[in-house]
């Protein structure tokens, strides 16, 4: 990721992506600024109903620039989506580390501590989606249907990594759990949480972002804790 894209991601971890609105008095954006504007505009367009597939012509028209201008900054539309995916990955992965305290969660914890930690990770991903609706279409692959298959694979790997994080959160130190099958329990719990997480994101997208993914979240997670 370039320094400009890294800054773009860092600035927007806690805020939704919004449509670019360059100052009318500036005729030429600063170096790297146009790339950010393109990604912001693409994300904003993905928030609109029925916006699963966006053409470069529509994106260029939205920004009042030519398609050739888009391709001066990105070699292909797939590369634009890769920019959004990098934002998703950097944002969510870094926040997950903040929750767990390390890249690999510490198993030296009680069962309830592990469950609480896993629930915070689930809540974080759902909150990220709620704040960045356009990104949800990318996360679920809806916006990537006609794009290079590697983009779909990358998002699949994203969710696999989140499930691995949940599984690691739910694993506890030997002797800390009275269950005879603690590893199996962790695998089952992480699978259930992951299904819930993806289901909430899908409902959010299918409702054109009316049904919030965090709706009654605490109550739902509490029921799954038993």
Segments the model singles out, each with a brief description of its role:
Residues 1-22, 127, 131, 164-172, ...:
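C-terminal peripheral helix-coil segments that are non-catalytic and often amphipathic
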Residues 27-34:
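Short, Lys/Arg-enriched anionic-surface-contact patches
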Residues 31, 81, 85, 89, ...:
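Amphipathic, non-transmembrane alpha-helical scaffold segments
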Residues 37, 41, 45-79, 83:
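Helix-turn-helix
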Residues 55, 137-139, 179, 205, ...:
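Short, hydrophobic secondary-structure boundary micro-motifs
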Residues 83, 97-131, 186-193:
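Hydrophobic alpha-helical connector segments
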Residues 93-97, 149-176, 184-191, 214-222:
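Amphipathic alpha-helical packing segments from all-alpha helical-bundle domains
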Residues 129-150, 202:
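Amphipathic alpha-helical segments used for helix-helix packing
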């Amino acid at each position: 990721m370039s320094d400009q894209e890294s800054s773009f991601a860092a600035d927007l971890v806690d805020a939704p992506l919004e449509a670019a609105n360059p100052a009318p008095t500036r005729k030429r954006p600063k170096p790297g600024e146009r790339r950010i504007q393109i990604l912001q505009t693409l994300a904003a367009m993905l928030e609109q109903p029925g916006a699963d597939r966006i053409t470069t012509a529509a994106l260029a028209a939205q920004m009042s620039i030519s398609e050739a201008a888009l391709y001066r900054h990105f070699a292909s539309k797939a590369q634009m989506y890769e920019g959004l995916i990098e934002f998703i990955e950097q944002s969510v992965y870094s926040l997950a580390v903040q929750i767990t305290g390390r890249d690999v969660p510490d198993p030296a914890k009680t069962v309830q501590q592990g469950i609480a930690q896993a629930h915070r990770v689930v809540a974080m991903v759902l909150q990220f989606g709620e704040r960045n609706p356009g990104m949800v279409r990318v996360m679920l692959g809806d916006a990537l249907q006609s794009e290079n298959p590697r983009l779909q694979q990358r998002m699949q790997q994203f969710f696999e990594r989140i499930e691995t994080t949940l599984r690691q959160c739910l694993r506890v130190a030997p002797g800390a759990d009275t269950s005879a099958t603690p590893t199996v329990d962790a695998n089952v719990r992480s699978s259930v949480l992951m299904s819930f997480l993806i289901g909430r994101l899908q409902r959010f997208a299918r409702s054109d972002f009316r049904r919030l993914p965090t709706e009654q979240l605490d109550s739902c997670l509490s029921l799954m804790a038993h």
